[in-house]
Each structure stands twice: as structure tokens, then as C-alpha cells.
């Protein structure tokens, strides 16, 4: 059933029940199925939810609980990840394949059950098994609970803006070929706004997102980068935007004419409709290519904003196009990413923990896989601190943790890189080529409950310096500082913002640079930390944080639900 609300007392099977009397259970059914569509002059079979691209928008209030029945009618294994949801004691619903569950096989089903606590804003959901995320995704909107309001002017309307990528090919086969050959997949054929490429692409004149506005009104744009592998610049001609939230955490208002958004990230921005009604205005997005030497699709998607009350007809109105930054404008990207700050004392604001229990320095980037007999070489690999992550095949990591099953993962992820070197020097492998090769493993870092962890994420340039959007499941983290070059504690500790840093679940670590993040491990379970450039995770750019149970029942992981899929 779709969008049903019932009193929360009727659902005693939920693992956590809100004490707020106005809270509800919001229940949906996701039918995962194949669909034949026409895009870019070609008919293509894709996998979608409920027959649409993007899939349905889930709307809840803070304090609600969600039950999503996923029925897999597709020919592919599937899982759904609820990107950015904390999943306090509901980690069995987090969704990454072989991390918290085995995939839902064709013809099978699974009910994701979780509560929405301490979060407001824009999140999203997507497939977390193979490249199906290219077409299996949608928005997850969390509004304040009844009687509470936004900490900014009430908008006239809320508008989801989801960026995507489109391939004129079978995306599952595309990923399988990339993994087999160790070569990145072909670039996408188009970018999309709400599933529509826009009129700069072939056979797409009438396939453009359109937004009608009323002059003098405010609109809340809920912007989501669901693109697979590309960070994006986004602008609206003749309009400025006020950022009020990032990754479902309120920010101090930040006025800008350009949004920069990495795969996995969300931005809430207010648009004030204050321009001439006799002109229309394109919204447009194109790549921020942090690694100029790496091929990327240098095309542009666009939608259009029309004002009501115009004296001219739609066909005769001029349409203005925004001037987007250069594809390689790292300074504009860095300025946007680093200028966001927290809305101190706003709803659900969490101060920075001042005392750190665990310190880690983690290198991230691409390398090469050592050649085995009868294999194609060289293959690209990716790693965190030279550990190239491999998904288990027999049992999910969370089940192994809960049932204490040995041999599924190793608890040896290091606090420091095994070899220290000049991380951002692109010529370092000329004298030490062995740095290029990574070891395959399924490595985890074990954390005691309530441990405060500080992680320095250090990009390296062994293959190509690149900005990696790093996503942590189950937590938000404070972004204390960012910079370029090699992190130097004697120089860079003074840059830490301990007062009002932004909190995120996905951070684009600067190209050829570093970032310092801090979080408290108060959520028991197995949580993957990985690059959200989708081709990089199967190459190995990930690791696991296993957070142990706390001392009480309310801090102890419950057993798996009876319908948890089997491998």
C-alpha cells in the first residue's frame, strides 16, 4: 500500500517506537521491476521502483517510523539504502549489500523498518547493489514534527531536484565488465534533472524539467546528487540561492549563485522568485571534474523556470542561460564546500565533541591490482590506507558480527597508513613503484560504544589526484577543516573549527588535499565508509566501522528480523 499513515501504537513490531503522540507509521510498497523507456533516440530497458524514474518521494515527519515493503520483480539482486538515516538500533534496515544484509533475490521481498529520530531535511534512497543505483533512486523528505517549524522563512512550495546520469546501455552489464577488466566503465551519455536530460541532448526537446513559479514567492529546492560518478556545478540564470541545510542538517544561511554537490550529497536551498515575469530562466548543471586527466562526459543538463502572469506567451518569452563555472574550477568548488557552517543552537544541532578517543589517518585513492595468473593486467584498484575492500560472498558482515561468525572479515584496519610517503606528489611512484599496488581484504576497525573518533582523510595522487566524496553510513560527522597538500598537524591543527563546523554524511575531500572529520560512535552495528563515486567501491575504496554494543538494552543491537534475506 502507498503512503498509508496509521497510529504508531498499532505497530508493536517496530524496534523503536517514538514517544511523540503525533508520530505515525508511514508505510509504502516498492515494486522493483524492469521498464522499457525511450531516451536519447533509443529504447532502453531499465530497472525502476513503481514504474517511474526517479522513484517515489517518501515524505515523513521527524519522529515518524517507516515501513517499506520491497518486492523484487526484477531479474537482478537488489537492496535499498536509506542514505543518511541514522538507523539507531535498526541497522538491519541500512541496506548495503553484503554489509548489513544479503541482497533481495529476484522474486523475493524484504520489509525495511526504521524510525526517523533527530533528523530533518532532505535525504534520499537508492539501490546499494551493483550499478542499479543509476535508475533506482528517489527523495526522502523529513519535515519538522507537528507544532514545529523550519528555522527559515516558510516556503510557498517545496521542490525536489534530483540529478542523475543516463547510459544508453545495460548498467549492470557495464559494471560487470568494469570489474572483470579492471577498467573504469564508459562515461554516461547524459545528465538528468528529475529523470529528464533537457533540450541540449538529442531527441530531448520535450524532455526537460519545468518549474512554474509566482513572483514574490519563496521555493525550497531539495537538491540531491544521485549521479553515479560526477560532482556537479548547478546554477539558475539571474537568481541567487540561500543554502539552509546540507545532508539534512541545518546550516547558517549561505547566499550563493552556484551550488557544488558531490554524489550522495543533498542541499536545501531557498529560491526567491524576484525576476521579470516576461523572461524564463534555465537551471543548468554540468560536471566539476576534479581530475582533468580523467575522461568525463562534458555535457550539460538543464530545466527551465517559468513565471506566472507573463504578458508574453511561453513560446515568445526569451530564456536566459546561466554561465556555469569551468569544468576544472577547483577554487569555486572548494569555496562552496568549505564555507558552509552549522546553524548553532538550531534544531538537532550537535556540538563538537572536544575529547578524542581514537585518532586515524586514512589515505584514499586509486592504485593497481597485482597481476594473478591468467588475468587481465594491469587492473585498476582503489584503497583506504592500502586496504582494497572486498565484499564478502557467503554472509553479510553485520550477521557475522551479531552471530560471532569467524572468517567473514578481519578486524585489522590500521589507524595509520602502512607506509608513509609524499601522498600528493604525482611523481612519487617513479622512485617507489611498489606504492601503486594494494592488498585485497575485508577490513574493519572495531570501536567501543561511545568512542569519539577523529579521522584525517588524505587524498593521494598515485594514479591521479581526485576529489573523493566519502560517505559514512549510520552517522553524521563534523567537518573540522579541509585543505590542499599533505596534512601537517603542526600547521593544520590550528585550522580546526570546533565552534560551528558543518555536519555531513558525505564529504568531498579536496583534490590533492585532506579533510579532518570527527564523530561519536554511539550507534552499534557494522557501518560502511566508502567513496560515493560508484565505480570506486567495487574497485575497493571502502572499509567498515564495527561499533560494539553499549551497556544497556537501549544501546544493544537487536536480533535480525525474521524476513532478513538469505544469501
Swiss-Prot record:
Broadest EC class assigned to this enzyme: oxidoreductase
Residues the entry annotates as binding Cu cation 3: 128, 473, 530
Glycosylation-annotated residues: 34, 50, 77, 115, 186, 298, 339, 374, 386, 427, 450
Primary location: secreted
UniProt binding sites for Cu cation 1: 81, 471
Keyword tags: Apoplast, Copper, Glycoprotein, Lignin degradation, Metal-binding, Oxidoreductase, Repeat, Secreted, Signal
CDD domains in alphabetical order: CuRO_1_LCC_plant (cd13849), CuRO_2_LCC_plant (cd13875)
Tissue expression profile of the protein: Predominantly expressed in tissues other than the inflorescence stem.
Required cofactor names: Cu cation
UniProt EC number: 1.10.3.2
Subcellular location: Secreted, Extracellular space, Apoplast
Pfam families per the UniProt record, alphabetical: Cu-oxidase (PF00394), Cu-oxidase_2 (PF07731), Cu-oxidase_3 (PF07732)
Binding site for Cu cation 2: 83, 126, 532
InterPro entries tied to this protein: Cu-oxidase-like_N (IPR011707), Cu-oxidase_2nd (IPR001117), Cu-oxidase_C (IPR011706), Cu-oxidase_fam (IPR045087), Cu_oxidase_Cu_BS (IPR002355), Cupredoxin (IPR008972), CuRO_1_LCC (IPR034288), CuRO_2_LCC (IPR034285)
One GO CC term, this protein: apoplast
Keyword Secreted: yes
Single Gene Ontology BP annotation: lignin catabolic process
Catalytic activity: 4 hydroquinone + O2 = 4 benzosemiquinone + 2 H2O
Residues that, per the record, bind Cu cation 4: 468, 531, 536
Annotated GO MF terms: copper ion binding; hydroquinone:oxygen oxidoreductase activity
Plastocyanin-like domain segment(s): 31-147, 157-310, 412-551
Range of residues in the leader sequence: 1-23
Biological role stated in the UniProt entry: Lignin degradation and detoxification of lignin-derived products.
Family indicated by similarity: Belongs to the multicopper oxidase family.
Protein name, per record: Laccase-7
Organism: Arabidopsis thaliana
Taxonomic lineage from the root: Eukaryota, Viridiplantae, Streptophyta, Embryophyta, Tracheophyta
UniProt gene name: LAC7
